[in-house]
């Protein structure tokens, strides 16, 4: 019986979405390697982190990986994490950037899987869809503890709070080995797909036979769901052909291209189209026959101008109402704040403004104060970005998912309850200047024989001579002081005090007390 050769047939797609200004996802799909990274950190930092990690894994896509697949994946992930740390050291402004990672290294009938963060891996086998990764998120811990159901987690306001990611700091990814079978279909996706699209709908799209059409359909579904985030997918089939694909596919931030699908006819799609549209002015040469131009009557022209004015005014009022009813948690001037509006700007004007700021009492109780109050005297400590742990700090810097004011207040309370660094200890008391602390010793000393009354010296017991010459004591001389008496051997055990540990650093392993 001939040996069956298993190969991959794959497709990858990435889209910026309808809300984000740039694409921070990066994806690589090749004959041996499928890898997807969802960057975070705001501005260009997320793009940098995801590109560095994908670049560190790309060399695994060789002709025959063989050997220990998990060891190779682990080494490549650590190299990518070290690259992030080195980049932050060169550019301190990138501190807080990070990325998720879900990757598969394929070798015949087996594959290695590495995962960290909230990007996901799915397996479609025999018509059944199974999630093969576990989200490293705060909401997933609530599900594990039985506090909420998986259905409630799907719409939980804190679903984007990541507990583990590649940020340049030491972290252990999840590594597993799996068996590959002919007919299996694997899906890697960012949370831009799994958040707005249900598993049932994902299953329907994955049942499309062609991998490219299936990937295209998944992106389309995410955009129709509002496209709140970058969305990236890899769809790969395990097939028993003699030859599979060999040309790798790059998409997202790592490709340098802005892959955008035709925007859906939804409110979010139309809003995104308005922000992206660029006017192209074409020069039209003058026509020779100017008399053939239709002439509009003054009444019709006035009607058109009035109609356009009404529509523009209505659009502005509706847009203003939508913006003013939207709230999200983000960094503002170094403080964790609730912002009103949406991220970004239009024609040079900011579309958001600070609304409330978190304030911590000495007993660590959270209250919200208006932005106008933050400039005056306070009986609480403003909740600073540096008070948060690094993963949550990166999330807030990028901006948490928007919603109602109650949603944003809930996010703020969740951060105060679960994401703060421990308070810095009070400074140690020091000795006053000029009074050094005495050394700590333990001694056993025998007295000198000259000081013992039980053994008087013969010279001191003789009577003093009489005469004009004054007696000179044998124990002292005015010209030269007597040397100190020689003691018996002394046993000394000095106790060396241990050096105190280095003090915690605010913003790194502790926060300033309220």
Curated annotation (Swiss-Prot):
Reactions catalysed, as given in the entry: O-phospho-L-seryl-[protein] + H2O = L-seryl-[protein] + phosphate; O-phospho-L-threonyl-[protein] + H2O = L-threonyl-[protein] + phosphate
Domain of life (superkingdom): Bacteria
Residues with PTM Phosphothreonine: 137, 141, 174, 290
UniProt KW keywords: Cell membrane, Hydrolase, Manganese, Membrane, Metal-binding, Phosphoprotein, Protein phosphatase, Transmembrane, Transmembrane helix
Cofactor annotation comment: Binds 3 Mn(2+) ions per subunit. The third manganese ion is unlikely to be involved in catalysis but contributes instead to stabilize a flap segment, which is partially disordered in the absence of bound metal.
Effect of residue 118 to N: Decreases affinity for Mn3 by 4-fold, no effect on hydrolysis of p-nitrophenyl phosphate
Binding site for Mn(2+) 2: 38, 191, 229
GO CC field: membrane; peptidoglycan-based cell wall; plasma membrane
Misc. comment: Overexpression leads to elongated cells and partially compromised survival.
Function, as annotated: Plays an important role in regulating cell division and growth by reversible phosphorylation signaling. May play important roles in regulating cellular metabolism and signaling pathways, which could mediate the growth and development of the cell. Plays a role in establishing and maintaining infection. Dephosphorylates several proteins, including the kinases PknA, PknB, PknD, PknE, PknF, PknH, PknJ and Pyk, the transcriptional regulatory proteins EmbR and EthR, the osmosensory protein OprA and the dimycocerosyl transferase PapA5.
Protein name as catalogued: Serine/threonine protein phosphatase PstP
UniProt organism field: Mycobacterium tuberculosis (strain ATCC 25618 / H37Rv)
Gene (name only): pstP
């Amino acid at each position: 019986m001939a040996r069956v050769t298993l190969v991959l047939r794959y497709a990858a797609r990435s889209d910026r979405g309808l809300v984000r200004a740039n694409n921070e996802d990066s994806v690589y799909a090749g004959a041996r390697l499928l890898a997807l990274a969802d960057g975070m950190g705001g501005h260009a930092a997320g793009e940098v982190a995801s590109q560095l990690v994908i670049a560190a894994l790309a060399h695994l896509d060789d002709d025959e990986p063989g050997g220990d697949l998990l060891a190779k994946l682990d080494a490549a992930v650590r190299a990518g994490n070290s690259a992030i740390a080195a980049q932050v050291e060169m550019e301190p402004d990138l501190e807080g950037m990070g990325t998720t990672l879900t990757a598969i290294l394929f070798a015949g009938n087996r594959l290695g899987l590495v995962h960290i963060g909230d990007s996901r891996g799915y397996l479609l086998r025999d018509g059944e869809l199974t999630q093969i990764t576990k989200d490293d998120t705060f909401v997933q811990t609530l599900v594990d503890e039985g506090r909420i159901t998986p259905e409630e987690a799907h719409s939980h306001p804190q679903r984007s709070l990541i507990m583990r990611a590649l940020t340049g700091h030491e972290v252990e990814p999840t590594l597993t080995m799996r068996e590959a079978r002919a007919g299996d279909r694997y899906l890697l996706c960012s949370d831009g797909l799994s958040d707005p699209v249900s598993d049932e709908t994902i299953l329907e799209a994955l049942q499309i036979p062609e991998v490219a059409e299936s990937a295209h359909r998944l992106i389309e579904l995410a955009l129709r769901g509002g496209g709140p985030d970058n969305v990236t997918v890899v769809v790969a089939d395990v097939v028993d052909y003699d030859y599979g694909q060999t040309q790798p596919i790059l998409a997202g931030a790592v490709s340098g291209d802005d892959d955008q699908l035709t925007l859906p006819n939804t409110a979010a799609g139309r809003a995104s189209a308005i922000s992206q549209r660029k006017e192209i002015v074409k020069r039209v040469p003058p026509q020779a026959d100017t008399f053939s131009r239709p002439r509009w009557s003054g009444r019709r022209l006035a009607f058109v101008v009035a109609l356009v004015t009404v529509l523009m005014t209505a659009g502005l009022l509706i847009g203003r109402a939508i913006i003013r009813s939207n709230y999200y948690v983000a960094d503002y001037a170094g403080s964790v704040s609730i912002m009103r509006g949406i991220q970004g700007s239009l024609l040079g004007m900011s579309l958001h403004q600070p609304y409330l700021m978190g304030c911590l009492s000495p007993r660590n109780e959270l209250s919200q104060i208006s932005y106008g109050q933050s400039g005056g005297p306070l009986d609480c400590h403003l909740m600073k970005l540096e008070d948060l742990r690094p993963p949550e700090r990166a999330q807030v810097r990028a901006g948490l998912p928007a919603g109602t004011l109650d949603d944003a207040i809930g996010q703020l309370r969740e951060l105060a309850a679960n994401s703060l660094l421990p308070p810095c200890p009070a400074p140690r008391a020091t000795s006053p200047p000029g009074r050094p602390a005495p050394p700590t010793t333990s001694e056993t000393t025998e007295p000198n024989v000259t000081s013992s009354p039980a053994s008087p010296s013969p010279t001191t017991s003789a009577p003093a001579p009489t005469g004009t010459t004054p007696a000179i004591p044998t124990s002292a001389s005015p010209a030269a002081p007597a040397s100190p008496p020689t003691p018996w051997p002394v046993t000394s055990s000095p106790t060396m005090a241990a050096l105190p540990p280095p003090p915690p650093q605010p913003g790194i392993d502790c926060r300033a007390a309220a």
